[in-house]
Amino acid sequence: MSDNFTSRTTQSSAHPFAAQLARHGIPESMWPYLLHNGVGELVEKLEIIFTGFEPQRVAATMPVAGNTQVYGILHGGASAALAETLGSMAAALHGAGRANPV
């Protein structure tokens, strides 16, 4: 079992997730909050783009195309993943500097 919330050391002084964070709309001023984990693989898969990312507000968009169920409408699991992602990111921003903000 791995601990995805405890800080890890980086191998270089450059931000290891810079390209990923920029691609998903995270402002550079907020990159330190995601230094060790980036945005995660599911954010990549669902193509979630953050339109607001600050301690007071986290917002994002996600395309319906590619995230549908068999009837062509947005999959409920994709909706739940978007909501959980926003909640986790908000917790990370509010819990910065504390152990395991989840």
Residues covered by each model-derived region:
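Terminal targeting signals and extreme-terminal segments of soluble enzymes
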Residues: M1-V102
